[in-house]
């Protein structure tokens, strides 16, 4: 009898343990599902914020989508892990969010900017940094660094602070080169769209305005190696009018 009770007690303990394991597994699935939902909502919120900036500059079309895809691709080419690539895919499209604070008279002016107007335009990186710095989340922190530094140049000729070399965060350097590539490939009222080959020639060899010295050397090398994928991304998310 005692032996039977012992067996029943052991079976009861085993069933309890299995029930606890099943409950824990169910909780983990629920938490995982919740986390996926939060991440999806977070990504959509970031996309909405980026789109809000682009409404100030409607010529850009699919630009914000391409920038994220380019940046993630380039991060992968540089050996970044999956999490880092996903972070910059979400963060890089926010690079121009500071334009929401730029007056339309300056931002949408069709002719060349005056010195005073260009000085106003050059404030948008700092405006973007102020907007994005309200959050301490890693993606937002990265986005704030990108917004502030994506117009800096490796040789120190950029703005707003004239940083050079390793003073510039690598995520900003990645965004810089993909932003230049996309601008070269895109049609604008003041210029035609360039082919992939033409854009690569300007980035790698320079054209007077753009120089290889503007770009972080390891980022430039990785970009050259990943250029076919960059071309594919552009073709996949091409502006409707092109």
Segments predicted by a language model, with ranges:
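Amphipathic alpha-helical coiled-coil "transmission" helices that mediate dimerization
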Residues: 2-47, 58
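Metal-dependent catalytic cores of enzymes that make or break cyclic nucleotides
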Residues: 15, 33-37, 43, 50-242
């Amino acid at each position: 009898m005692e032996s039977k009770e012992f067996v029943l007690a052991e079976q009861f303990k085993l069933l309890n343990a299995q029930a606890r394991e099943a409950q824990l597994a169910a909780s983990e699935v629920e938490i995982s599902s919740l986390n996926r939902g939060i991440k999806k909502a977070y990504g959509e919120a970031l996309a909405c914020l980026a789109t809000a900036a682009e409404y100030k500059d409607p010529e850009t079309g699919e630009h914000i989508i391409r920038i994220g895809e380019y940046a993630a691709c380039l991060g992968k080419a540089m050996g970044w892990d999956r999490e880092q690539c996903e972070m910059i895919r979400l963060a890089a499209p926010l690079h121009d969010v500071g334009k929401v604070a730029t007056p339309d008279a300056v931002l949408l002016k069709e002719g060349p900017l005056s010195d005073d107007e260009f000085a106003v335009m050059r404030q948008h990186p700092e405006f973007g940094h102020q907007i994005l710095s309200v959050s301490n989340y890693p993606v937002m922190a990265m986005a704030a660094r990108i917004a502030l530094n994506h117009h800096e140049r490796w040789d120190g000729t950029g703005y707003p602070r004239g940083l050079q070399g390793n003073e510039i965060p690598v995520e900003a350097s990645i965004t810089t080169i993909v932003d230049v590539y996309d601008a070269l490939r895109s049609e604008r009222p003041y210029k035609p769209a360039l082919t992939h080959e033409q854009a690569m020639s300007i980035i790698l060899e320079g054209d007077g305005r753009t120089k290889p010295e503007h770009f972080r050397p390891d980022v430039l090398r990785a970009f050259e190696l990943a250029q076919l994928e960059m071309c594919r991304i552009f073709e996949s998310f091409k502006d409707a009018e092109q």
